[in-house]
Amino acid sequence: MGKISSLPTQLFKCCFCDFLKVKMHTMSSSHLFYLALCLLTFTSSATAGPETLCGAELVDALQFVCGDRGFYFNKPTGYGSSSRRAPQTGIVDECCFRSCDLRRLEMYCAPLKPAKSARSVRAQRHTDMPKTQKYQPPSTNKNTKSQRRKGWPKTHPGGEQKEGTEASLQIRGKKKEQRREIGSRNAECRGKKGK
């Protein structure tokens, strides 16, 4: 007695075989090679199981998953951590020696920082500005002192003259003349008293 098979199964087999025969005639041997190669890699990756991540691959995966938040290599301990707890394993132990999935990687991402309120941003603005350089008085070397005694115009550190230097020089000149006159009068008075 022959095998009993249903009509749809026989039709499927015939149609499938005919389809493959037509395809076989039109496919080149290189196409068949690439098709077989794809099937082998697909089946080997499906049976290999989850992949482990170590070293630079692990860091790249964490950076991709966590983004700007950053990540920890050890699970961050909370405020109430106690020494009685079992030693915690790190991401390397979990993902390098065993398989690791996306949820496990996300556990090591740093928490999102809360958005700052408008008040704290305003209060922080003055601290974000770069510090200005402190004013340094000009050096007091002999040339500068002699220039001041001679009544030369003062200059800013940038080399520019102060506004109104001509007027201030005239005032200084008048004051010097007044001092000389007072000094000469005092000398005359002293000379008369000594006689």
UniProtKB/Swiss-Prot annotation:
One of its GO terms (molecular function) is insulin-like growth factor receptor binding. GO terms for biological process: activation of protein kinase B activity; androgen receptor signaling pathway; blood vessel remodeling; bone mineralization involved in bone maturation; branching morphogenesis of an epithelial tube; cell activation; cell population proliferation; cell surface receptor signaling pathway via STAT. Residues 1-21 form the signal peptide. It is found in: Secreted. Residues 49-77 are annotated as: B. Residues 22-48, 119-195 form a propeptide. It comes from the Eukaryota. One of its GO terms (cellular component) is extracellular space. Residues 111-118 are annotated as: D. Residues 119-195 are annotated as: Disordered. Disulfide bonds join 54-96, 66-109, 95-100. Forms a ternary complex with IGFR1 and ITGAV:ITGB3. Forms a ternary complex with IGFR1 and ITGA6:ITGB4. Interacts with SH2D3C isoform 2. Forms a ternary complex with IGFBP3 and ALS. Belongs to the insulin family. PANTHER family: INSULIN-LIKE GROWTH FACTOR I (PTHR46845:SF1). It is linked to Insulin-like growth factor I deficiency: An autosomal recessive disorder characterized by growth retardation, sensorineural deafness and intellectual disability. This is Insulin-like growth factor 1. It comes from Homo sapiens. The gene is IGF1.
